[in-house]
UniProtKB/Swiss-Prot annotation:
GO terms for cellular component: nucleus. Residues 221-237 have a biased composition (Pro residues). InterPro entries: Hist_deacetylase_Gln_rich_N. The lineage of its organism: Eukaryota, Metazoa, Chordata, Craniata, Vertebrata. This is Histone deacetylase 9. The keyword Transcription regulation applies. Belongs to the histone deacetylase family. HD type 2 subfamily. The gene is hdac9. It catalyses: N(6)-acetyl-L-lysyl-[histone] + H2O = L-lysyl-[histone] + acetate. Residues 172-222 are annotated as: Interaction with mef2. It holds the Pfam family HDAC4_Gln.
Amino acid sequence: MLQTIYESESYFSSDGVAGREQLLAEQRMHAMIGKDIKSEFPIGLESISPLDLRTDLRTAVPVGDPGLREKQLQQELLIIKQQQQIQKQLLIAEFQKQHENLTRQHQVQLQEHLKLQQELLAMKQQQELLEREKEQKMEQQRKEQEAERHRQEQQLCHPRSKDRVKERAVASTEVKQKLQEFILSKSATKEPLTNGTSHSMGRHPKLWYTAAHHTSLDQSSPPPSGTSPTYKCPPPGNQDDFPLRKTASEPNLKVRSRLKQKVVERRSSPLLRRKDSIVSSSYKKRIFEVAESSVSSSSPVSGPSSPNNGPVAMEAEHETPVLSVNSRIENLVSHHHLVHHERSLSLLNLYTSPSLPNITLGLHATATQLNTSSSLKEQQKYDPQAPRQGVSMAGQYAGGIPTSSNHVSLEGKANSHQAILQHLLLKEQMRQQKILASGGTPVLHQSPLAAKDRVSPAGRVAHKLPRHRPLHRTQSAPLPQSTLAQLVIQQQHQQFLEKQKQYQQQIHMNKILSKSIEQLRQPEGHLEEAEEDLHGDNLMQEKSSSIDNTRSYSSTDLRTGPFGSVKVKEEPPDSENEIKTHLQSEQKSVFAQQVT
């Protein structure tokens, strides 16, 4: 419609009246459109008269009035423009309405989306809270269960302690009464004890203390080993005379006895030496008491005021004849037999091989002494003066060497190499005897074959303070190669050679028997050849036996060579040669009988 208006304006400018007429005709044709728009005009425009654009009315308008037509056309143009503006406003209003509706819908959708997201977040948070609460509840339950278990364990472990506390809180009056009785009995029995044992107890109060301590400890539990205790038993009339502990609660006694048993079980290993050290200490104390009693009997005038007479008497007795020494040795042997019989028998069963680990490091040196002293019996066969020398040596060194070697030497096996060891031991002890007789004391140079705990009697009397435990190696490595180890290795090698020789002889005899059986099957023409073969074999055996004998003599000379003055002659093994000749003669006789 706007296009028609623009066309009409351009047409008016070119053709004045003709264009106007055509325009009016067109406007009449569109009269129907104007009627429709008229209802949409505002109220202020209703006063304007509607245009009559119909073409039928063209004849009714006078043609000669151009001014009126122009006015009418201008009015129509204005109306058209107004209509266009109104339409624009309507379109804009509709657009705005639609835009507002769309924005509202979009906002509603956004709000709904936000609400959904918020609800989802809230659900997630609730789930997380629920999970956390569950975890906290589970942790609390676990803690409660652990606490209950701990309480149950404590209740199971500590009912005895509560009972002990209750029992300990009771015995106060009984303790006081027993202490008073003990003090009274001690004060009453102190005078006769001091009068009877003034000689030994006065100089050695430590022995009395150890005896009392052992009685207090060993009343509740029996001694762990079969040895006799180190204290003297009280007289039967004084049964109430016993030392008490600080607390007289009964469970404490049980605990101490159990602890003692545990310690004994733990220290049953041969590497540990506490169990043996108790026995050895008691044995040393008894030897010391016997020595004192012998000194006091030899010099009855001497008492507590003259303690230096003991070592002088002992040194004087070293130079006395052998008969006085033998009586003392017998006393010591009988006394030691009661204490160390079981231990000596157990030590005899040990295998002392230098190739094996040193298991007996924690024990005393009695094992080596048992090995060396077992040769006294054989020495009595070869040398009748050896037992006398051994007895005199033992008497002169009775304070340092334990008497178990004298007791076990009566049951030793015969062995030539052990005789060599005994001779070396006697020589070393004679050297130390000369040093003692001259007035010196051997401190640095001691024989490796002698005992480790050797102490002179004078030093034993003068040494009152307790000694430290001797240090020992803690490794299980074999001992260094000493003279004992070398001799043992040589002895084993010689035994191996003898066994090999016997095996070869047995093989040779089997061959001879097989040949004899074959010759019996063959004709009699080969008998002379068989006899010659047998004669040649006998000659070969005699030569081999002579060679072996010369080798054995050379080996003994080599063994005794490094020791210098020590040489032991070994007799040739005649028994084996006699057995060989006897077997050969029997074979010849059997062969001759079969031939005939």
